């Protein structure tokens, strides 16, 4: 079996449902230490992380990823045990196959192959791996980055191994992500009998015009790299469940996905201004999951674009679509951040899989990128 596929299978066999690492990181660490990496284990709360580095000079290329996976869902819906990798119809099945144990395996084998051919490479190679990406993402990459930043440690380039390919392997490199800002809004009224509305104040009715106005706003037009900022309601709850009671409060949860045309503070101020103008009695809690980031050009994009084209024959598209990733934290200590990995069609689904032929190709793309940036 191909070495990258073999390692991917070993990782899939470990039930690393978030935030449990289940020994995946120690498997990777053992191989990295054999080729000269210094490894720093960083455990925060129940989360395992490690920061590994080979070399002490600049420039530094970092590979970043996560060993944790999402829950399997109903086992009866799987064709086979989700933690027993199975090869069928040209695909490797198992939870985490695409998101992102194939990428983790490809990181390791690409580095092993590169170091074997270039033991005295330029600069440094690093890995940042966490078991807290699919969960709350507080004690994972964010905490590691904060530790690195506190001691003044930065790096030049980072490849996050997220499954970015959309229709065929190699078609997409993510060179940025939108920011994510969520709000939990509680509007207060006066509860009462539904037959006596003059003795109550219905907060749903009070809020409705403000919600309609928020939904109609064109926040910006986007730009060459990002689509327009989006505001969406995710949940609304009000009332006791009874049909004869006017509720005393209504709670609305919403989310902004915002481009570099906006700032979190600017969006917050706009929402507060609108709610105040409508005269609402409200409380509003905010949660900023991450600011937008963008790597428009640079040596890393040039290197990985060339590697993808040489291995797959496809010139990849650069885009910033999709949800957030740990790149939102890494950007604080890294000059250029991109994401590249296998097809994402089955991630978080039952019968998650990755094409068998794509796994060694992924390793070769990472190896060629390393060679382009760090070979002497």
Swiss-Prot record:
- Binding residues for Zn(2+) 2, per the UniProt record? 99, 134, 348
Where is the signal peptide, in residue numbers?
Answer: none
Q: By its UniProt entry, which CDD domains does this protein fall under?
A: M20_DapE_proteobac (cd03891)
> Could you cite one Gene Ontology molecular function of this protein?
acetylornithine deacetylase activity
User: EC number(s) per UniProt?
Assistant: 3.5.1.18
One Pfam family recorded for the sequence = M20_dimer
| Binding, Zn(2+) 1 | 66, 99, 162
Tell me the active site. 68, 133 (proton acceptor)
Gene3D superfamilies per the UniProt record, alphabetical: Zn peptidases
Q: In which pathway does it act?
A: Amino-acid biosynthesis; L-lysine biosynthesis via DAP pathway; LL-2,6-diaminopimelate from (S)-tetrahydrodipicolinate (succinylase route): step 3/3
Can you state which reaction this protein catalyses?
N-succinyl-(2S,6S)-2,6-diaminopimelate + H2O = (2S,6S)-2,6-diaminopimelate + succinate
* Cofactor: how and how many bound: Binds 2 Zn(2+) or Co(2+) ions per subunit.
Q: What class of enzyme is it?
A: hydrolase
User: Record's NCBIfam families?
Assistant: dapE_proteo, PRK13009.1
| Protein family | Belongs to the peptidase M20A family. DapE subfamily.
PANTHER family, per database record: ACETYLORNITHINE DEACETYLASE, N-ACETYL-L-CITRULLINE DEACETYLASE
Quaternary structure note: Homodimer.
**Protein name per its UniProtKB record:** Succinyl-diaminopimelate desuccinylase
Starting at the broadest rank, the lineage of the source organism is:
Bacteria, Pseudomonadati, Pseudomonadota, Betaproteobacteria, Neisseriales
């Amino acid at each position: 079996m191909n070495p990258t596929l073999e390692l991917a299978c070993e990782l899939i066999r470990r039930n690393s449902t978030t935030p449990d690492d289940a020994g995946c990181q120690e498997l990777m660490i053992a191989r990295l230490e054999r080729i000269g990496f210094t490894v720093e284990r960083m455990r925060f709360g129940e989360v395992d992380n490690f920061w590994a580095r080979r070399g002490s000079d600049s420039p530094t290329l970092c590979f970043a990823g996560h060993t944790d996976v999402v829950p399997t869902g109903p086992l009866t819906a799987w064709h086979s045990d989700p933690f027993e990798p199975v090869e069928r119809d040209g695909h490797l099945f198992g939870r985490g196959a695409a998101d992102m144990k194939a990428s983790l395996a490809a990181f390791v084998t690409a580095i092993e192959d590169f170091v074997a051919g270039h033991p005295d490479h330029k600069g440094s190679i690093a890995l940042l791996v966490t078991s807290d990406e699919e969960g709350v993402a507080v004690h994972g990459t964010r905490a590691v980055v904060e530790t690195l930043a506190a001691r003044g440690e930065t790096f030049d380039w980072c490849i996050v191994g997220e499954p970015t390919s959309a229709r065929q392997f190699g078609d997409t490199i993510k060179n940025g992500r939108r920011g994510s800002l969520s709000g939990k809004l509680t509007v207060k009224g006066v509860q009462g009998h539904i037959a006596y509305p003059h003795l109550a104040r219905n907060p749903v009715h009070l809020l409705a015009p403000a919600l309609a106005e928020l939904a109609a706003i064109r926040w910006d037009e986007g730009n060459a790299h990002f689509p327009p900022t989006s505001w969406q309601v995710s949940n609304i709850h009000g009332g006791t469940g009874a049909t004869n009671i006017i509720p005393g409060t209504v709670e609305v949860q919403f989310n902004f996905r915002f481009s570099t045309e906006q700032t979190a503070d600017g969006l917050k101020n706009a929402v507060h201004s609108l709610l105040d103008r409508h005269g609402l009695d409200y409380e509003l809690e905010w949660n900023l999951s991450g600011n937008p980031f963008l790597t428009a050009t640079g040596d890393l994009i040039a290197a990985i674009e060339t590697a993808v084209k040489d291995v797959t024959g496809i010139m990849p598209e650069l885009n910033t679509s999709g949800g957030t990733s740990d790149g939102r934290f890494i950007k604080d200590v890294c000059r250029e951040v991109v994401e590249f990995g296998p097809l994402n069609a089955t991630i978080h689904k039952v019968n998650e899989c990755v094409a068998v032929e794509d796994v060694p190709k992924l390793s070769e793309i990472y190896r060629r990128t390393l060679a382009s940036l760090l070979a002497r």
